[in-house]
Structures are given as C-alpha cells and as structure tokens.
C-alpha cells in the first residue's frame, strides 16, 4: 500500500475526491458522482462546476428545468438520463429528507440512479464514514492480483470488507 500511496500522490485527485475535500458537501459529492459515471474525470469536473454555478443545493437544482440541467451537464455521458436523475434526486431530497443527503447505504440506495459505488462514495467522501467504493478498476485489479476471487463489484466489496484493514477502505478506490 505504501508504494501505491506514493505513486498516486503524483497524479491529480479524482474530481469527486477533490470536490469533497474542498466543500465537505455530501450533496455535491452525490451529484458529482452521478455525473462521473461513464464519464472522463476532466468532463466530470467541467460539467459539475458548470452545474454548481447554476445550482448548488437541492432546492436550486429542483427549480431548474430538465433541459437546463441537460445543457449544463453536456457532454457528460448519458447527460439526458443524468439530468432527469439529478432533478428527481433533488426533489426527493427536499420532500423526504429535508434537503439533507442520507448518511446510510440503505437510504441512498432508495434513490433511482444510485448504486452501491455511488452510495459508498457519498458515505466515504461526503461524511467520512467507512465504506469501500468498488468500481470496475477496483474489481478487476484486486481479482487480477489474486487478492480476492469474485464475479461482481458487489461481491468484491463484501470480500474486501472481510480482508482489508478499515484504514484502507476509504482510500482503496483512489489508490487503484
């Protein structure tokens, strides 16, 4: 892990990590993570920042039209689907959670468009709670190294929880 940490320090921070460190805002972490799915990091940064200039809270985002959100987040991958998802999440946060992003996996998974990776990222980067964000890289690399033998990212998360010391849970995704 020491070698990985040393090498990763030479690279720019992933945008979602950067936004979490700069803002400590679980809502911005959640929205940036949704934008990051199937999108290059530079595009995630560009589109997130453009969107947050227009609207940085659930109330502000919910007040925007879907087309306005689409325009702000283009060229993020699947921008039309993401625009609807972001608007619906914002409305649900206002209606059911008093505009506060939930701090549990179970509650986060109730949002359409939020999977385990996104939920874990919100917990780890938005709330500094323990969690393991497993994307395709973490799944593929840990299996290739022979650290685990799993068939899906969900299985990988469970297996890593059993063998990885908790001090590495939050950082494993950034390291790989």
How does the language model describe each region?
Residues 1-176:
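Catalytic cores of DNA base-excision repair glycosylases
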